[in-house]
Amino acid sequence: MPNELSERCSVIEECYEFMLAYAGQGLAGGEGNGQGGLIRDFLSRAAQALGGLESAYASVVKQMGLNPAEPYAAFQEVLARDARDSLVAVELALAQPIISSQLIDNLNASIHLRALLTDLFLIDEIFKGIQHRESPAGAAGSAH
């Protein structure tokens, strides 16, 4: 998967992994352990990554010249909606003065975030498969 899209996906996935660990700590929020600042940092970076996810996907599809174009364009709409919905949920969490483990656990459980993560895993596998087929080693290996 080309760089910008890959980087955005990585930031979002890293945030989700940190959120899982944070949710399991049972923090009421505002503790002096520094985790409150870290969760805000992860969420802020994820929000930035979510904001440009659709355009990064569109760039990859265009750059790779993927055809037929219709399924990729239709999925772009799904990805845009899921990214937008996830961004709203992340921004709502960031707007809270205290971010507890329970709040993050509920954010983790959000169907919006789960749908987005599934979208990311799906496009990652699709683009990996395309790149493998187009690489000289992949093309040679598929001839057997």
Kindly give the residue locations of the regions a language model identified.
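Amphipathic protein-protein interaction modules
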Residues: A58-N108
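General "foldedness" signal
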Residues: G26, G30-N33, V60, N67, ...
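Core of compact, soluble alpha-helical bundle domains
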Residues: M1-Q63, G141
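Amphipathic alpha-helical binding modules
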Residues: S86-S142
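Short alpha-helix boundary/capping elements
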Residues: L20, A47-E54, A83-R84, R114-F121, ...
